[in-house]
Amino acid sequence: MADKEILAAEAGSATIESLAGDRSARRPLEIFAAVFVAAGLIYSVHLGADALGASEAYSAWAAAKPGVCAIVRTPVLHDPGKQLLYYVVLHYYTRIFGLSEISLRSMSVIFSLTTLALVFALGCEMLDEHAALAAAAMWAFNPLAVVFAHTARMYPMFSAIALAHLLTLWRVRSRPGVIGAIGCGILGAAMPYTHLAGLLILGAEAAILLRDFVRGRRDTLAWMAIALAIGLFIPYIPVAIQQSQGLIYGHWLDYLGPPYNYPLAAKIAAALVAAGFTLWLVLGRAVERDADEPTRLLVAWIGLPTLAFIVGSVILHPMFNPRYLAPGMAAAALLIAASIGAWSTKWRNLLAAGFALACLIMLPFARSRPEPWRDLAAQVAAGGPSDPVFFEAGFVSNEDTANVANGGFPFGYYSVPFDYYFAGANPRIAIPGFDSETARMTIEERVSSAGGGWLVSWKEGGALNAELPDPKRFKADEKLRAERHPVGVVDL
């Protein structure tokens, strides 16, 4: 009898321990669910409060095209560097939900939440549940993640596709399967169709697989996935090359600026540093206990595209903007969690919680002022219906390149966000943004006959004054000036 009581007690104790273990195992998932819900609420706040920015208006303009063929022509002809997959997906999404600010931005919220879920899933696969939770907490409330979620642009979609591709590649490496390899290849092709930086990610993944090959690991299906991704993108390569040329030319007039003209020695040094870092990633001695080397993989996946942009900017031409690395920013949370966790799991958890709390405190102060398109439309509507609205044709340029002739945006870059909010009959007139004399003469002629007008300009100071009509005959008042982008509105 006593033996039976002892056995019963031991069985009961084992059951209690099992239940406690199950609850402990579920705790990271339960906490992540709470983080996910909180992130969804934060991402969804103020979606329709701010006017669309100029780039967001281009997303709406492309999505409103009648079909896929017209959408494909939009980035090719008018908006170099923007890839078509985001516009196509947004087109069908807005056919269901409409073209309002909330509808346009809500798709970014969906992809941002998908990115957050993929950060957690990758952490569980590559590291452990607690590291995954720490990484998800660091990314969920990061101001960058919130900005991406609040913007109707391709970056949340790009991040979600890239992280989904990384997850499938990881699984194909560790648990090879034909279906998984095909899915990995399709996702890999979707990356450059969303943003050309996806090609650099594919290159980084090829370096990872090359390391596996050098160490005697074949990864046949993983190589097939990369080959499938490249094969599916090949038909678009001529268009991508044309777009890249237009993108680089257009953006050196704008925020990228002209070549840095570093000395040859600096260019050689940059190339050698990049080559050395790549060789270390591919051939360096293993320092991780896990044969899959998750930390090295993350370093390569994040670091090699970043290095390519930096070295390309030094050797060739400025080509780097931090938002091009949106997938790497999300993956960096995993790398940070893994690195700190290797030192101390306690400090990793504390720092992750502290960082998330700090981000939540910062969020109310991180909002920038919206662009003035809504206000501009209201002011023009309050004026005369015959007053022309002038837009500068050409790429948006900086002060040093304002007079460089170019064929970008022949209808005027800022006409698209203006037309999103304004449906009046006022004539829209494109003037050459790189030819101030011709622009001024056109403005004087049309304003004289109409009795008034509006100039929407990206210029400031002397460059703007050179376009304005003769102050002895015309009065010009600056009505609006945006903070984030060089948008000025002058009432003539």
Where are these regions (language model features)?
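Short, intrinsically disordered terminal tails adjacent to the first/last structured region
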Residues: 1-25
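Terminal, non-globular segments
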Residues: 25-492
